[in-house]
Swiss-Prot record:
Pfam families: ACCA (PF03255). This is Acetyl-coenzyme A carboxylase carboxyl transferase subunit alpha. Belongs to the AccA family. The keyword tRNA-binding does not apply. Pathway: Lipid metabolism; malonyl-CoA biosynthesis; malonyl-CoA from acetyl-CoA: step 1/1. It catalyses: N(6)-carboxybiotinyl-L-lysyl-[protein] + acetyl-CoA = N(6)-biotinyl-L-lysyl-[protein] + malonyl-CoA. GO terms for biological process: fatty acid biosynthetic process; malonyl-CoA biosynthetic process. GO terms for molecular function: acetyl-CoA carboxylase activity; ATP binding; carboxyl- or carbamoyltransferase activity. Its EC number is 2.1.3.15. It comes from Pseudoalteromonas atlantica (strain T6c / ATCC BAA-1087). It is found in: Cytoplasm. Keywords: ATP-binding, Cytoplasm, Fatty acid biosynthesis, Fatty acid metabolism, Lipid biosynthesis, Lipid metabolism, Nucleotide-binding, Transferase. Component of the acetyl coenzyme A carboxylase (ACC) complex. First, biotin carboxylase catalyzes the carboxylation of biotin on its carrier protein (BCCP) and then the CO(2) group is transferred by the carboxyltransferase to acetyl-CoA to form malonyl-CoA. Disulfide bonds: none annotated.
Length: 318
């Protein structure tokens, strides 16, 4: 799998290219111990360089990682974390929005409802998923599934990964803002545990619409913001070239968001980002979800709702 190295990873990319070149040379002939030793040394050097680079990433670099084309999406996490997933479609009012997926699944022995944004890999899939930007029918589908989960006393797990809610004319005509607002209101009062995780981009109201929970997590190299760095830069400085400055000023990275008390935990990613090893990223996320769900299941409905209310009301207070 091509890792699609980002600009700041160029030194790592150069080393990996050398490793691949030596590997191909050795593959075609007899086993050469000297080449194998050189490959081992280069791999160690690459790992050391990766640790150094990723130990000091800025908010803009994290933003690039959050959008990495090979980063695992909701449909990559579901089979790695859950079993017996049965997708449920449609909002029962207008259409089935492919930018939001959801359905019943098993988390080990626990039945749950899982809901998440879904982007696409290739052009055809990106168009089908509307680049991960849901329309009102997507959020109404999510709401239908969450209310179903409450009826059957199922915990709700959501995965957030969207640049934002779709801003098209049709979406606005069908009540985009109302759909988002209704989700916020209903999620705040659902009588079942809700665990939300930002796995990539957490873009504005489009993220919040499935992001009101008892526990909110972010993957190590995910972002959460009211607007994209490019959008902010275009408004403040009239140029998207100022996006790195905007990213730092907005504080979009997980560490900065946690300092503000807006999330509960940061889920560690493999060295280099979740796209380097989907299985390890999923295993880390599963462990966090299971631990948090065990804590929430020990609470009564009254305690659950009281804690959720206190969490939400604490935002914005010093």
């Amino acid at each position: 799998m091509s890792l699609n190295f980002l600009d700041f990873e160029k030194p790592i990319a150069d080393l990996e290219a050398k490793i691949e070149g030596l590997r191909l040379v050795n593959q075609g002939g007899e086993f050469d111990i000297s080449i194998e030793e050189e490959i081992t040394k280069l791999r160690e050097k690459s790992a050391e360089m990766s640790k150094k680079i990723f130990a000091d990433l800025g908010a803009w670099q994290v933003s690039q990682l959050a959008r990495h084309p090979m980063r695992p999406y909701t449909l990559d996490y579901i089979p790695r974390i859950f079993s017996e997933f049965d997708e449920l479609a449609g909002d029962r009012a207008f259409a089935d929005d492919k930018a939001i997926i959801g359905g019943l699944a098993m988390l080990d022995e626990q039945p749950i409802m899982v809901i998440g944004h879904q982007k696409g890999r290739d052009t055809k899939e990106k168009i089908k998923r509307n680049f991960g930007m849901p329309k009102p029918e997507g959020y109404r589908k999510a709401l239908r599934l969450m209310e179903m989960a409450e009826r059957f006393n199922l915990p709700i797990i959501t995965f957030i990964d969207t640049p934002g809610a779709y801003p098209g004319v049709g979406a606005e005509e069908r009540g985009q803002s109302e759909a988002i607002a209704r989700n916020l209101k209903v999620m705040a009062g659902l009588k079942v545990p809700i665990i939300c995780t930002v796995i990539g981009e957490g873009g504005s109201g489009g993220a919040l619409a499935i992001g009101v929970g008892d526990r909110v997590n972010m993957l190590q190299y995910s972002t959460y913001s009211v607007i994209s760095p490019e959008g902010c830069a275009s408004i403040l400085w009239k140029s998207a070239d100022k996006a790195p400055l905007a990213a730092e000023a907005m504080g979009v990275a997980a560490g900065q968001i946690k300092e503000l008390g807006l999330i509960n935990s940061i889920v560690e990613e493999p060295l280099g980002g979740a796209h380097r090893d989907h299985d390890v990223a999923a295993a880390n996320l599963k462990a966090t979800i299971k631990q948090q769900l065990a804590q929430l299941k020990s609470l009564s409905v009254e305690e659950l709702l009281d804690q959720r209310y206190e969490r939400l009301m604490s935002f914005g207070y010093c």
